[in-house]
């Protein structure tokens, strides 16, 4: 059996779009596999993407949380993409803009058929805010698997880190096996192998594996 692991270091910028409608205009239809990354504006989403892909500037980090307003799409190969959704919930962003972003996020989760998994990034020191829970609930309602990624785990001692991880797992237990919880550090790479394993699994849904196998036989 050949190694089917995806090399996330091969991620390349594909497009930016202001909302789901424009995303549909730029992509070749709602096909293939997409894995989306969402989180509050100070959750370290861009840094996590850069660490996972081992690229310093794949996702641009900003000194001003909430600045990233676009949906940014990165191609892993011709069938698979990573989607960096706009950060949500930052206090200094105007209310009208917040509502626009939240509408776009909800629309994407509920309408994008090729969405194979959602990573919800949360600062481990401030997990499970209202909007985080809303994102998780939206995804679960749409039968989309979720990874609740507790970022900046290097900021806590090991005992405090594991307590928070266990507390979050208990809080999300009612969602069942569709929601996983893992600690992560963009600075030190803590948790990276486990996260990449989950993402790789999402990159290989049965229907895509079967379609690619059929294509090879033709």
From Swiss-Prot:
Q: Which UniProt keywords apply?
A: Cell cycle, Cell division, GTP-binding, Magnesium, Metal-binding, Nucleotide-binding, Septation
> Could you say which residues bind Mg(2+) here?
46, 68
The primary gene name is engB
Q: Name one GO cellular component term.
A: cytosol
Described function: Necessary for normal cell division and for the maintenance of normal septation.
| Requisite cofactors | Mg(2+)
The record, for SUPFAM superfamilies, names: P-loop containing nucleoside triphosphate hydrolases
Source organism of this protein record: Shewanella loihica (strain ATCC BAA-1088 / PV-4)
Q: Which domain of life is it from?
A: Bacteria
* Name under which the protein is recorded: Probable GTP-binding protein EngB
Q: Which residues participate in GTP binding?
A: 39-46, 66-70, 84-87, 151-154, 184-186
UniProt-listed NCBIfam families:
GTPase_YsxC
List each copy of the EngB-type G domain by range. Answer: 31-205
GO function term, MF aspect, one: GTP binding
- Tell me which Gene Ontology terms the entry assigns under biological process: division septum assembly
The family note in this entry says: Belongs to the TRAFAC class TrmE-Era-EngA-EngB-Septin-like GTPase superfamily. EngB GTPase family.
């Amino acid at each position: 059996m050949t190694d089917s692991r995806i090399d996330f270091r091969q991620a390349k910028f594909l497009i930016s779009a202001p909302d789901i409608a424009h995303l549909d205009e730029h992509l070749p239809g709602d096909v293939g596999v997409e894995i989306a990354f969402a989180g509050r504006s100070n959750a370290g989403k861009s840094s996590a993407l850069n660490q996972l892909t081992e690229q310093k500037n794949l996702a641009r980090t900003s000194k001003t949380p909430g600045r990233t307003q676009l949906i940014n799409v990165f191609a892993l190969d011709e069938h698979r993409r990573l989607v960096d959704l706009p950060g949500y919930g930052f206090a200094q962003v105007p209310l009208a803009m917040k509502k626009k972003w939240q509408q776009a996020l909800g629309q994407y989760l509920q309408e994008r058929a090729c969405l194979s998994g959602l990573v919800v990034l949360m600062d481990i020191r401030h997990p499970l805010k209202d909007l985080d829970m809303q994102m998780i609930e939206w995804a679960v309602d749409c039968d989309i698997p979720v990874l609740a990624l507790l970022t900046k785990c290097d900021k806590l001692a090991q005992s405090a880190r594991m307590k928070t991880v266990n507390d979050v797992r208990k809080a999300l237990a009612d969602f069942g096996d569709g929601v996983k919880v893992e600690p992560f550090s963009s600075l030190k790479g803590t948790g990276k192998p486990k996260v990449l394993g989950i993402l790789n699994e999402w990159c290989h849904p049965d229907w895509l594996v079967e379609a690619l196998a059929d294509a090879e036989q033709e």
